[in-house]
């Protein structure tokens, strides 16, 4: 016993010494004292910018090529559409997610679609495309959203409206709503998060913690630190593993339960994936479905939070949306949810959602890793193993891309002369990625966002309650754009 303890202590000190050696010597090989690296390491950028993404936007605007290098992160960051096309389309095979990315998110996402490459990625993408594109799944998803709106969302909003002065965190509502709906779609499981008095879901909390701590891994300038903490099971890495254990336990229970009850007549994704995934590979099944759960929950909520924040600052846009809803659905509140055919006629609402995601994309940036040495379209040299990031948040704020009115919330930029929605080239607007990795859940996400927007805008007036939130949005670290402090609003039902 004494020998084991002694060995553990020696191992611990060896790791500490090795970590310090790594920090003090090896990191110097890629560290320089340039303005960008110094500002990143010392966080001096915080003196002038609220969000890291705003600082990156400033740097990318200042760069003649809209591309910068952050040497301490071994990273190239770009807001140049020609580079985005090169990364996502022209030279796609040289920019996989990469082993480095898989290590960062592997504990949470395993071999899921958002953390895989090659045959594993192709298999899941083909499978997911078939399922999400099927009429039965789309009808099932719309019915889930419709039921959640009618039985949970609207009663809660009415309850707060009946209590003047009460404050509701809309971001929390959207996260609860989307977690309920994506859980039902993915697992056939209802966590029942969107009900008063807003219960704490063990599953949802575990997801929040795991995604936050995984994102912090990706931002770490010295990866060996979090790897050492993971090895020793201490600090944030211990907390991350505990959260992932909760996810694994609950997901495992749901998979076992579904295998016992059978798949016949089930439209949820786990039932459909079970039909093609080997019976002895529940871990792979868990990875597939958890990836969809993570993407479907956080991105929709993030997109809606930015959208409603912008509406409170632009009542003229909200009024035009209401005019369109009255034209398509009729006046009055007889219809609280929109049919799919009605939503297809809502071009101005569609344009407003796209415009809000231009300014506040749910995923602010996305990274790949270069397999081989390469040269980007703007002439930037990329070494093998370099992390290459295209920054959707910055791209939405570039006058070179959107013109001198880039700061304006202007849905009209998405409409043609007849008022019909006109999409932009995805390499200019990579909110849903582009090329082979374009988001396969885009249509379903837009359906959910439109459904919620219609239900709220027709029935209620919202006003931001916090002076700080009124002026700007401060984002918390995470895989998606979560607003620090939420979106506190006061609700009033329209007459």
UniProtKB/Swiss-Prot annotation:
Intracellular or extracellular location(s): Membrane; Endoplasmic reticulum membrane
Which amino acids does the record list as binding heme? 439
* Membrane topology reported for the UniProt record: Single-pass membrane protein
Q: What is its EC number?
A: 1.14.14.49
Cofactors needed by this protein, per the record, are: heme
The family database entries (CDD domains) matched by this protein are listed as: CYP86A
Induction text: Induced by methyl jasmonate and wounding.
Entry-linked InterPro entries: Cyt_P450 (IPR001128), Cyt_P450_E_grp-I (IPR002401), Cyt_P450_sf (IPR036396)
According to its UniProt entry, the protein's GO biological process terms are: response to wounding
One GO MF term attached to the UniProt entry: alkane 1-monooxygenase activity
> What UniProt keywords are attached to this protein's entry?
Endoplasmic reticulum, Heme, Iron, Jasmonic acid signaling pathway, Membrane, Metal-binding, Monooxygenase, Oxidoreductase, Transmembrane, Transmembrane helix
Q: What does this protein do?
A: Involved in the oxidation of the plant hormone jasmonoyl-L-isoleucine (JA-Ile), a bioactive phytohormone of the jasmonate-mediated signaling pathway. Converts 12-hydroxy-JA-Ile (12OH-JA-Ile) to the carboxy-derivative 12COOH-JA-Ile. Exerts negative feedback control on JA-Ile levels and plays a role in attenuation of jasmonate responses. Also functions as in-chain fatty acids hydroxylase in vitro. Catalyzes the hydroxylation of 12-hydroxy-jasmonoyl-L-phenylalanine (12OH-JA-Phe) in vitro. Converts 12OH-JA-Phe to the carboxy-derivative 12COOH-JA-Phe.
Q: Which family does it belong to?
A: Belongs to the cytochrome P450 family.
Q: What's the name of the protein?
A: Cytochrome P450 94C1
């Amino acid at each position: 016993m004494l020998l084991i303890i002694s060995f553990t202590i020696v191992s611990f000190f060896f790791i500490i010494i090795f970590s310090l050696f790594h920090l003090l010597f090896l990191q110097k090989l890629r560290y320089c004292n340039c303005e960008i690296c110094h500002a990143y390491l010392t966080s001096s950028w915080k003196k002038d910018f609220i969000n890291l993404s705003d600082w990156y936007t400033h740097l990318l605007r200042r760069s003649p090529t809209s591309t910068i290098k952050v040497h301490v992160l071994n990273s190239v960051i770009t807001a140049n559409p020609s580079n985005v096309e090169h990364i996502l389309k022209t030279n796609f095979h040289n920019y996989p997610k990469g082993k480095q990315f898989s290590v960062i998110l592997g504990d949470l996402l395993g071999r899921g679609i958002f953390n895989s490459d090659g045959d594993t990625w192709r298999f899941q993408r083909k499978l997911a495309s078939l399922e999400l594109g099927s009429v039965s799944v789309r009808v099932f998803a719309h019915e889930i959203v419709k039921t959640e709106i009618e039985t949970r969302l609207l009663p809660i909003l009415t309850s707060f409206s009946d209590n003047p002065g009460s404050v509701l965190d809309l971001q929390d509502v959207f996260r609860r709503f989307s977690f309920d709906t994506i859980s039902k779609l993915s697992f056939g499981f209802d966590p029942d998060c969107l009900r008063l008095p807003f219960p704490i879901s063990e599953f949802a909390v575990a997801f929040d913690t795991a995604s936050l701590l995984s994102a912090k891994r990706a931002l770490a300038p010295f990866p060996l630190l979090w790897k050492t903490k993971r090895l020793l099971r201490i600090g944030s890495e211990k907390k991350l593993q505990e959260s992932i254990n909760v996810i694994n336990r609950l997901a495992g229970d749901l998979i076992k339960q579904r295998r016992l009850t059978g798949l016949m007549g089930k439209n949820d994704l786990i039932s459909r994936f079970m039909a093609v995934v080997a019976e002895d590979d529940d871990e792979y099944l868990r990875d597939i479905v958890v990836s969809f759960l993570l993407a479907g929950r956080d991105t929709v909520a993030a997109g809606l939070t930015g959208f409603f924040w912008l509406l409170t600052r632009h009542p003229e846009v909200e009024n035009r949306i209401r005019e369109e809803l009255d034209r398509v659905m009729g006046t009055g509140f007889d219809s609280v949810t929109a049919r799919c055919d009605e939503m297809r006629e809502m071009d101005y609402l569609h344009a407003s959602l796209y415009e809000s995601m231009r300014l506040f994309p749910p995923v602010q940036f996305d990274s790949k890793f270069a397999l081989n040495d390469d040269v980007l379209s703007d002439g930037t040299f990329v070494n093998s193993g370099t992390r290459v990031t295209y920054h959707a948040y910055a791209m939405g704020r570039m006058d070179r891309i959107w013109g001198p009115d880039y700061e304006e919330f202007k849905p009209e930029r998405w409409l043609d002369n007849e008022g019909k929605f006109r999409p932009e080239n995805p390499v200019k607007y990579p909110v849903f990625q582009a090329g082979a990795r374009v988001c396969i859940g885009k249509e379903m996400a837009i359906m959910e966002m439109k459904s919620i927007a219609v239900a709220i805008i027709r029935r209620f007036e919202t006003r931001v309650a916090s002076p700080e939130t009124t002026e700007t949005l401060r984002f918390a670290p995470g895989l998606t754009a979560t607003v620090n402090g939420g979106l506190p609003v006061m609700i009033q039902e329209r007459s």
